[in-house]
Each structure stands twice: as C-alpha cells, then as structure tokens.
Amino acid sequence: MKKYDVIVIGAGHAGLEAAFATSNLNLQTALITLDEKGIGMMPCNPSIGGPAKGIVTREIDALGGIQGKAADATTMQMKILNSSKGPGVWAIRAQIDKIAYQRWFKQQIKQQKNLDLIIAEVSDLLVENNIVKGVVLSDQKIIQADYVIITTGTYLKSITHRGSVCVDEGADGTKNAKFLSDALVKLGFELIRLKTGTPARIKKDSIDFTNMILEPGTNQKIAFSHYHPVYKPYDEQLPCHIIYTNEQTHQIIRENLNKSAMYGGMISGIGPRYCPSIEDKIVKFSEKPRHQIFVEPESYELDSMYLGGFSTSMPIDVQEKMIRSLPGLENCEILKYAYAIEYDAIDPTQLYPSLESKLVNNLFFAGQINGTSGYEEAAAQGLMAAINVNQKYQNKEPVILGRDQAYIGVMIDDIVTKGVVEPYRLLTSRAEHRLALRNDNADDRLMKIGFEIGLLKPEVYDQYLNNLKQIKEILNWLKTTTVGQIDDLKFTTLKTNSYLIDYLKRPEIKLNDLLIYCPIKIEDEQIINKVQIQVKFEGYIKNQEENLKQLKRLNNIKLHAIVDYKEVPNISLETIDKLNKIKPLDLEQASRISGVNLTDIAMIKYYLERIKND
C-alpha cells in the first residue's frame, strides 16, 4: 500500500482536527476509522463551546484549525454565556445540528488535498528500534508512515452499560476497537479505565413544552471563526428548554440504585466529576431538592431531543419511570435509552508536552485516549499533535503553548504533568491567567503562531494585522484626546483636561458613546469589543499578573495549621477531597497535586494569613 507521512487513527473530533492540519501542512495523510458512521459523530451533547471550552474553539480557529468553522456552519442556536460577569469567563456556546456537522466534515474530507480516508481497524503498530513505522490492520495489511497520531476516543475495548446489560460496542452502537489496547500494553504503555455516559433521547412531538422554561438563542452576530464567520439568523434558531427533577424522580433513583451499572458494581472505570450521572447527583448532593435538566434539539432533520444533565446507567425499565416523572415528559416516547460507556485510555504522563510518546518516537496521542473529555478538548489536542508532527518533520522545536498563552496550554500542561484519575474537563478555574485568556483575544495570543507554522492563511493574518492597526489607532485617539476637545462632553464631571481613555474606564460609559466623535470610522463589533475590554479591565489584568508573581515565592509556606480544607474559602470540592487525602506539607507540594491550581493556592495562602492574624 501507499506510504504516508502521517497516519491518524480515529476520525472523531481529535482525529479530524489532526488530519486536516497535517494535510493542510502538505503532509500526505491517511485518516483511518472503524466506521464511516463515526466521522465527526456527536454521541453525547450536540453542542460546541461553553465556559472555557468555547474559548478553546476560538483558540483552535486562531491557530488555523477547523472546528470553529464547522460549528458556525452547522449551528442551530448561538448564545453568549456569563455575559453578566467579567470578560475572563465570557464564552460562546452553539447548539449543533449533529447530522449536518457530520455531513459537513464528510464533504470536506472528499475535497481535501493530501488526505485519504481508509475504513479499517488498526490492530497493531509497526515499531522498529523504538520508532513507529506504520500500522497493521485487522486483515494483516500494513500501512507505512513516518508518524502516527492515535485519536481513538472512547473506542478502545469499550463496553456500554444499561443496568446489568453490558454490550461490547462503541458509542451509539458503533464498532469498537478490540486490539489496539493490547498493542499499546505490549509496547509498555500503562492504561487506565475510564467511564462516561449519555442521556436518553426523546421524541419531540411527544413532549409537552407548556410549563418548561424557554432558553432562546441570541440575536447578536457571534461566531467561533474570527474572519470567516457564518451567522445563524435569530428567527432560524431552535430554542432549548429547562426543566427540573423532583422528589418523585429522586425516590425512583434511590429505590433502584443497586440496579445502576455504576452503583451495582458492573463498572470499574472512573466517571467524569464535572458531568456526573443523575444517580451520582442524587447520592452526592442528597440535600438538593431538584436538579436542572436541559431539553435540547439534536438536528433540524431529527425529531429527537437530548436530556442534558440526565445521563444514567440504569436499566431500561427504571429509565422509563425516571423520565416520565419529569414535567412535560409524562407521556413522552423514548427514542433511545441512556447508557454508560467504559473504555481504555493511556496515562498521559507518558507523553511529552508536544503530545509525543516518551516510549515510542514519532508516536503521538490526542483526545479522549489521553483521559480528557469533550469535543473541544479533543480537537485542541488533535491540532497540537498535528502541529508538532509537522515541527518534527521539519526538524524544528515543538510548539508548546504556555499556561499564560492559551487554555490549550493549561489543559496539556495539566494532563502531561499531573496525569488524570477521571475524565479531565477544562474549566475557567483551572486557568490562573484566565483574565488574559479571553474569548475576544484568542487571535492576539495565537494567530502569529498559526501563521508562522503555515496553518493560518496569509489573507487571514493580513486581516488580523489590519484590525490590530485600527485598534492601536483608536487607543491612541483615546489616550491623546481630552474631554475638553469634545463639546458634548465638556459638562461631564471629569476635568476638561482628562483624557477620553479615563472617561471610558467609567462603568456606565461605552466605547460606542465616544466613537461618534472619532475621526477613525470603525464598524467592526469585534474591534470595538476588544478596545473596550482592554481599557476597562487593564487594572485587573495587571493586578492578576502581580499576584501570580508573588505566588511563585510561596514554596516554603507550611500547611500544618490546616486541619480540614473545607475551612478554606472558594476552593472546589475536587480540591478539598485531594488536599484532605494527601495532606501536603507545603504549598509547593500542594501545587503539584492533580486538580489543584494556582487559584486554589492563592485561596490557601489567604486563609493562612487570615487565621494567623485572628
């Protein structure tokens, strides 16, 4: 068979991003997948974005990746989350048409140069002198390549669970990968067993939406892609809805806990802390009288609704009772029952920050096989693995994004340094530099890198530079124009010799209020938004950077005064659990614990200072 520069194993979100990046960088690429049905599949929530994750998709786009364009082209609803809070946590979320999303990617694959799609199962890796040389298919055919990127998602020896019923299959009834796990173990890789799950799907026409809380999209022009945006008109967007569980729901779950695959002992894999099953919520948060559920559309072409927040591994008969206890679903038709899925992943501490294996040269890993969760986290890793394959191909240093540079950098640093014990999910709280890692400035942080690598097209980078020039011109006008120079502003409470940039720092003043006097005519909302954030939050960003410098000098602070970390304010339950279990001696040791970030360290320091002064 033909020899390739790169083989990508798996055509999910990580694999697609990797394959398009390597082929766009003129590397001959083979994309191998078990089943065409799995290309770009969204087996769980049909959405892209959300807190931290939406910023990751913007970062992917800024580097020259493809996920943002795919999401913009196939969205059913767009929203800006956390808009009432500071810009450090603003995020875009899109409800995606999962049928259109897969179709979009399949069409792109057909048109893509340097990319061949192969439907087959990889059963082994071809390795000589600790260097990967290609793959062996299940029919014993060999495909040679200089580099291999493994992006197998949740398919390695995967098993689905509904109560005591276990099926040897992949997500949504697809094929699973039966042999590659053994091949990795043979090469010396340590594997971990993880678990995730997905809720039931309900027939839309059987739902009573009357008393549900409506969650519409936005009429603002927002998109993931910086300079190729596709906007979904508001009147074409599909609404989501919110309902809540009730005591009847909780009672059904409590009475049947022993039938749950997870609580009944059928599952050995560890599930995601930040996306727990509904039975996990009832057990761990027993004091809560209700839990929120999102009723969301899956496609313009499907009559199915997704129950976000209601995943379970209960048997089918119990699921029916649980679902029909929910408001509006009393008489619903269940199209597909929920299930949990167990799968193999590698311990990601066996990877360099480039995502290359420490055990086998030229072998890279990306996506859920690295212990992460989420389409966005997967795509980001696929992109970075592809970038670093190209860097190595050209005998260049790997591209390693810093924690102060991108959420992608935060994620990769976390997983390769600390490892994972449960599916890793990106959160804004994991980023100690989150005021600098905003939705609006992904292009400022990463487009130069994308352009220098060769992924970002020159015309896109030129447009970015032109925008940057306009931003500098506006900032210069604000810094050099006084209130007294504008007749309409002479009667404000500011002194007439005050500059407009100081006037803009007032919370009630918007940049658009001042631009009507500006000789530079700007209509691009993206530019206006960037300038406004830079001016209004300049002080906060500088303060955060200073605090981070101080935190680096805390290595010798001892923690023996803390008996129970529940007393420390504003740290997560995950952090409390791990600190109470490990009992670190000092802040340096605490900072190395998986899941403990610099924000947590700052809270511990604050608590120690407080009890010292009491």
Swiss-Prot record:
It comes from the Bacteria. Pfam families: GIDA, GIDA_C_1st, SAM_GIDA_C. It is found in: Cytoplasm. Signal peptide: none annotated. Its cofactor is FAD. One of its GO terms (cellular component) is cytosol. GO terms for biological process: tRNA methylation; tRNA wobble uridine modification. FAD binds at residues 10-15. One of its GO terms (molecular function) is flavin adenine dinucleotide binding. Disulfide bonds: none annotated. The keyword Signal does not apply. Its main location: cytoplasm. Keywords: Cytoplasm, FAD, Flavoprotein, NAD, tRNA processing. NAD(+) binds at residues 271-285. NAD-binding protein involved in the addition of a carboxymethylaminomethyl (cmnm) group at the wobble position (U34) of certain tRNAs, forming tRNA-cmnm(5)s(2)U34. HAMAP family: MnmG_GidA (MF_00129). PANTHER family: GLUCOSE INHIBITED DIVISION PROTEIN A, PROTEIN MTO1 HOMOLOG, MITOCHONDRIAL. NCBIfam families: mnmG_gidA. Homodimer. Heterotetramer of two MnmE and two MnmG subunits. Belongs to the MnmG family. This is tRNA uridine 5-carboxymethylaminomethyl modification enzyme MnmG. It comes from Ureaplasma parvum serovar 3 (strain ATCC 700970). The lineage of its organism: Bacteria, Bacillati, Mycoplasmatota, Mycoplasmoidales, Mycoplasmoidaceae.
